[in-house]
Amino acid sequence: MKSKYKWLFILFAIWIYRIDFMPADGGGFAKAVQVVTLFGIYFLVYKYQRNILGYSYNRTNVVVKSWIVLYVWGVISSLWAFLPTFAFFLALQNIILCLFLVWFYGMFRTFKGLEKAFLLFVVSLFLFEAVFYRLLVRPTFIIHYLPSGSTAGMCMAYCFGEILAAKLNDNKRKKLLKGCFWLSFLVLLTSTSTGANLSALFGISMACMFGGKPVYAVLMFSVVGALYLFKDILDYFMNIFMPGKDETTIQAVTGRTIVWDEIKRLSEQRPLLGWGYGCVERVASVNLNIQAPDAHNNWIGLKGSLGWIGLLMGVYNMATATYIAFTKRMKRGYVGLLAAIACGIMNGYSFGYLAGKACSITIVFCSLCVLTFYYNRVKDA
């Protein structure tokens, strides 16, 4: 990476630190950091590529375009939002992050260079979160932090899919894929996030299915299905890592089931337009008198915040990403993308990373969307 770009990535590092480890409660400093870093990122991206907005919408594929349209709708929702400024900023944030990723991945002209940049970027994200969470929040070996586990899960699914697909597998690429796979596995192994782990299993199942190992896929799907159907098995493992707590208790502690019920009730009041991007969980927080910073579900969150229109836009984005990865699965990189996208979509059932505040999961899923475009344009070498 050329040194002239260092400030852009310094700003991004500060932004992700703010998102992960600086609570917005109790003052405006954290919010100011987020605003300054985000608009600093946009200013520098615009400086390096003046046509970035037009390029991102007019010259990319339907996946990137649908991402931008979804969050433009989120910006528009500030006109009727419960918290107008809040909705406007959060939606605009996801547009700026997409522009940043379109610019970043667009710098690479070869597939191997592009893939390496993506993998190192994702690994840096989840290692940063896994290490700093232990240093700043909870100094234990086993942690419960969904963003790091989820990003690691998507990375692991991608690497596993590409290892099985065995396209362009020179020794350097094999070592990179295997190294990133085992780092991802280590982070997942030391995480008690049920959503992240089950999503990773689902992504790996998809990798087996389309990477030439359908028998393994059936076995993996059976494991995932068994864990969903037989909750006592899940509770058994929960008690190993989180003594005295089962899945129901954990969900009740975070308020998920209570918040979901309230969001569904609120969705019925504004079915078409919703309460404004990222706002429905805030309305639920006021009504229930609890802290609910996240809807913990993309589908419920999008329906509550952006109504049926926003939900259909979100489904369209995920569907087109899956479709393009599936139809191009015979090309290098796309089996990995298909597995990682499946993992990310499954993750949306436990964390609303597309329906509210952005986090590392949002960054990685948006990266997958952008790569569905760039993987088809770069050279093999």
Language model: regions and residue ranges:
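Hydrophobic, aromatic-rich transmembrane alpha-helices
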Residues: 37-53, 155-168, 309-328, 367
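Transmembrane alpha-helices of multi-pass inner-membrane enzymes
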Residues: 38-44, 337-347, 353-381
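A juxtamembrane structural motif centered on a specific transmembrane helix
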Residues: 1-5, 166-179, 330-331, 352, ...
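Alpha-helical transmembrane segments of multi-pass inner-membrane proteins
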Residues: 71, 75, 97-103, 107-137, ...
